[in-house]
């Protein structure tokens, strides 16, 4: 039995869940999310809990059991509280600016980077060097933050680039030089 998969998911007030033909829809105060549930896993909806169980003990069913439970829990959390990831931009002249749903990044290249934000993702820019990526889909929030970071990842000598707010950069010493 999966240690994560066997835990029931509490459904908060204001969240509606519908499960039809292996499609799960979760609606809440922040929006709605849908996902197709993998084969080999079944879902039991009771009054205010969701229980995930597997049909057999095959390798596919065992691996999908805990994953399905975690994905459903992330959907419920997303439509109630949402998810956010903080990014920091370090470097002279490095800045971010939001125009509509396009994030303009100036990261030391000869050209500005215009990043089109996906639907369902909001970005808040604070002092042109701090970004807060918000949304209800945890996977999409993390993926968007990773794409923004990938434009100019932090370098180990001066720490310039885009990094996660809680990320520590291992710094290297430069060349000592010949005297």
From Swiss-Prot:
Gene3D superfamilies in alphabetical order: Ribosomal protein L6, alpha-beta domain
Please, which domain of life does this record's source organism belong to? Bacteria
Q: GO molecular function of the protein, one example?
A: rRNA binding
Provide the GO biological process annotations.
cytoplasmic translation
- Please list which residues make up the signal peptide: none
* Subunit structure, as described in the record: Part of the 50S ribosomal subunit.
Q: Which family does it belong to?
A: Belongs to the universal ribosomal protein uL6 family.
Protein name stated in the entry: Large ribosomal subunit protein uL6
> Which source organism does the UniProt entry give?
Geotalea uraniireducens (strain Rf4)
């Amino acid at each position: 039995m999966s240690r994560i998969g066997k835990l029931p998911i509490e459904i908060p007030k204001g969240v509606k869940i519908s499960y039809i033909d292996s499609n799960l829809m979760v609606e809440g105060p922040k929006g709605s999310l849908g996902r197709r549930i993998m084969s080999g896993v079944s879902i039991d909806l009771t009054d205010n809990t969701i229980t995930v169980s597997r049909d057999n003990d095959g390798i596919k069913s065992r691996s999908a059991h805990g994953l399905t439970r975690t994905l459903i829990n992330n959907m419920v959390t997303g439509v109630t509280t949402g998810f956010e990831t903080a990014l920091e931009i370090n470097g002279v002249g490095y800045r971010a600016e939001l125009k509509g749903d396009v994030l303009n990044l100036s990261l030391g290249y000869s050209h500005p980077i215009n990043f089109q934000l996906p639907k369902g993702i909001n970005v808040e820019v604070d002092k042109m060097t701090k970004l807060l990526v918000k949304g209800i889909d945890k996977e999409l929030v993390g993926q968007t933050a990773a794409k923004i970071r990938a434009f100019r990842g932090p370098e180990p000598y001066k720490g310039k680039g885009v990094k996660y707010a809680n990320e520590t950069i291992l710094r290297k010493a430069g060349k000592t030089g010949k005297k």
